[in-house]
Amino acid sequence: YDITHGVGLAIITPHWMRYCLEHNPAVVAPKFAQYGVNVLGFNPADGVDVNARKAIERTADFFRSLGITQTLRDFGIDDTHFGEMADHVLTAWFGDYSKSFAPIDRAGIIEILTASL
């Protein structure tokens, strides 16, 4: 699909963040909360879970404030090729995501893409 890299990231990133937080909260929540405190200026007293979720929403809000399209559907993309896209990510990009920040497999990639519709 003909989407610039930055726009694609703006669409996918909040959904990737939600996926990571849901699937590996013990590791991800402190990192996202730290991002919220150190980059977005959140109050650490609000707690890790609150700040992690707020960081995701604030990130999505930031992309919206730039006027960036928020869904893959806005580009005429549906789920027809999500399986192929997931396979491409796993083979043509960096490969094994099972040991990443929040492990992501083929089904996880499809879940993130679907949430981005």
Which residues make up each language-model segment?
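Active-site segments that bind and position negatively charged phosphate/pyrophosphate groups
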Residues: 1-58
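C-terminal charged capping/lid subdomain of soluble metabolic enzymes
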Residues: 36-117
